[in-house]
Amino acid sequence: MSASETPSPSSGSPFWRFSLRFYRQSEVADACIALQEQAGVDVNLLLFLLWHAAQKRALSRADVAELERRIAPWRNMTVIPLRTMRRALKSPPTLVAGARAELFRTKIKAVELEAERLQQEAMYELAGPALLGVAASSLEDAARANVAAYAAMCGGAFPQPAIEILLAALVGRGRKPEE
């Protein structure tokens, strides 16, 4: 997701709108990409956990594992192949190069973003009107608990500098997540 290609933050679910606004904050995109590349994090799932944290909801490792189980088929069949294709087209084969290859890559990027949006909308529907998890004492406590639950589900710890950037951006946001 890049700020120049993102749709209007006024469309979609509250979770999608939160994601667009949050991702546009300074250093957030780089931190998300670092976590994706270094630790295999599903950025959409991480954003979902941070969105819940913004509403002071802490999810358990079992909650996160169930979310992962439900979203993995879509991610693996659509989002990851589109991302792989988009990245490969940064250095296209010589048969189709230059502006035509870049135009095609831009179209793939738009489809990738739409696949991510569809995943996020489905995740929002999974939560339903009642949010997942349990009430936490603070936004930061919920965020740390949700990230820890995700890391535990993945079998390890996430790179701390990237996590701290995301937590600082979330805690310092100063607005409700649905705004």
What are these regions (language model features)?
Residues 2, 16-20, 24-26, 156, ...:
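Acidic, glycine/proline-rich low-complexity segments that act as flexible tails and inter-domain linkers
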Residues 28-72:
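N-terminal interaction modules that seed assembly of large macromolecular complexes
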Residues 31, 41-47, 78-81, 100, ...:
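Residue-level detector of well-ordered alpha-helical segments, enriched
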Residues 59-65, 83-96:
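Short acidic alpha-helical/loop segments enriched in Asp/Glu that coordinate divalent cations
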